[in-house]
């Protein structure tokens, strides 16, 4: 539908921007001028090896790995398509029949939008963790300020550290993240 297509375009654009930001934080030599998804994948794989296989959980019931097929496709153009390829197809060539008999824009469906949104959530959590590490915000001098947590998604790699009435703290690869 057109609504899914618009959502996919907006989410995909945010993923592109935040991927570049994450790569520039985790690799001080990252060239932001020459950046595309294959470059992001290589940098993230090298610096954050658990990222591609991390799972996003929807409302504590359904688990999926939104980045796995994206990373596989970055290394092998013949790999099964992912939400990222659909996003690019919609962005650059909406009416082409790149994925079977359907025009690309018809691949803008609930599943691809959900995978894109889960991928964006995962990126945001890793970005937050790297900012906390970079600026050493996980210590006694700078008490963590809570951020609003997602009512839809959680990351499998984030484990509950402790829970209070007003917020919860999670351990995310040894970094504390406080969420409301």
What are these regions (language model features)?
Residues 1-9, 74-81, 104-111:
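Short, solvent-exposed segments of well-ordered alpha helices
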Residues 2-26, 114-124:
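Short, hydrophobic, well-ordered secondary-structure elements
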Residues 15-85, 92-97:
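Short non-catalytic regulatory patches outside canonical folded cores
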Residues 37, 106-109, 164:
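Intrinsic-disorder-associated interaction segments
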Residues 82, 91-103, 124-135:
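Substrate-binding/catalytic groove segments of enzymes
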Residues 84, 88, 114-117:
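Short amphipathic alpha-helical surface patches that serve as generic macromolecular interface elements
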Residues 106-152:
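Amphipathic, Lys/Arg-enriched alpha-helical patches that create a basic surface
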